A protein has these predicted regions:
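Core catalytic alpha/beta fold that binds nucleotide/phospho-ligands
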Residues: 1-278
């Protein structure tokens, strides 16, 4: 997002979200987190505008007690929206029903002084016995960590789809992956299934892919969709990979909701003073 138009787009973006969203984004210490939060809000608003045909300023959101966003105005819609940010990316997913969740992870291979096995052992309480076995049996450090991030994305995605958020025991969520599938960039996988407390959960579809060479993502949605839904039925045409967008897309047909003094110059300078994570 940092191009020659970044300053203009940033100053427009912080004024194109409600005041409370702007203020929340400004609270973050790092630039990365501020941008990610801002982009998440723009994704939700831009998608809702396109799905409903409503004007930018007419759209209103609320959040559940666990923090999951949902559309309030215009009313009468039941589609789901979700965002996630980690590493260098913010991702967005939607579905025809309200139950949809997405998660993204950067494939960080540096773990301080820990080997992959040591790192996995330190996180063992979040994994089932089956998941731990699959992680530990991988032949290389990189493959072990890639599978760890894969499982983590899946767990986050289903918890966001259900709206549960953080749970005490992630090991109850036991994902079964098809070892015959190639988990690599360019592939789109939907074969993964879920057991919760050893009971199969047929309700969910998990869509897994690499956003780019350094980031993996998982989307969770309900399997049974209405016939009016664009994704109704199973076919290769429904394999929707993530596409990268820019500020121009996110701000299309936007308007000012949060006018700032100096057209946002002070806020932009404040942003520049913040450190980057990496």
């Amino acid at each position: 997002m940092e191009d020659e138009n970044f300053e203009h787009n940033f100053r427009l973006a912080i004024q194109s979200v409600p005041k409370e969203d702007y203020e929340k984004s400004m609270c973050f210490r790092f630039r990365d987190d501020q941008i990610a939060t801002l982009v998440s809000r723009l994704f939700l608003r831009q998608a809702s505008k396109r799905f409903t045909g409503a004007k930018w300023e007419e759209i209103e959101f609320n959040r559940t007690q666990k923090g999951k966003p949902y559309l309030v105005t215009p009313s009468g819609y039941n589609f789901g929206l979700n965002t996630s940010h980690q590493g260098d990316l913010t991702v967005f997913a939607s579905s025809c029903t309200s139950e949809v969740g997405v998660d993204v992870m950067r494939l960080d291979m540096s773990r301080g002084d820990k080997t992959a096995d040591e790192y996995i052992n330190s996180m063992a309480k979040s994994a089932s016995a089956n998941e731990l076995k699959n992680m530990r049996c991988q032949p290389t450090e990189q493959m072990k960590m890639t599978i760890f991030y894969r499982y983590w994305c899946l767990k986050e995605a289903v918890l966001k789809a259900t709206g549960q958020g953080i749970v005490d025991d992630l090991s109850r969520y036991d994902f079964r992956i098809d070892t015959n599938d190639r988990y690599k960039q360019g592939n789109f996988l939907t074969s993964t299934t879920l057991l919760v407390d050893n009971e199969f959960q047929p309700k969910w579809v998990f869509e897994e892919s690499f956003v780019d060479a350094n980031h993996v993502a998982a989307t969770c949605r309900t399997k049974n969709l209405t016939k009016s839904c664009t994704l109704y039925g199973d076919s290769d045409a429904n394999k929707m990979f993530f596409s990268k967008v820019n500020f121009g897309f996110l701000l299309d047909d936007s308007c000012i909701l949060n006018p700032l003094p100096g057209n946002g110059m002070d806020a932009y300078n404040n942003f520049l003073q913040k450190p980057k994570k990496n």
